[in-house]
Amino acid sequence: VTKRFVRTVINDQVPETFYDTIRSENRHYRLEQLKFIGDTVNEPVIANLCRREGLDVNIVGANISPMQGSMMSVFILQLIGETDAINEAEAYIDQSGAIRKRLTIDWENRTVMESA
């Protein structure tokens, strides 16, 4: 119930067209959800990711919402590259103050969910 309520306040779903696009992707990638709350909203985390050697960043979904006198941004990113480059990007995100969750795709139901 709480997840459904939060989902109505914060649109963290990927667009339907994304599933067809991602199926055709033949490069190694991971999906990540990044949440920026409060002061972390002002940090150039995604811009810095885009500058990393050997890493492509695709913004799949995004939402920015006021939340109790502050701001919250939620991005769903596709990080594309070799395993080492993606691992380094994840480490950078983790130390940046953003909240990161790795996501997986349930192809049968065409939904994105948090990885186990």
Protein language model regions, located:
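Non-catalytic connector elements of ABC transporters
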Residues: 22-116
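Conserved beta-strand-loop-alpha-helix hinge in the C-terminal portion
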Residues: 1-15
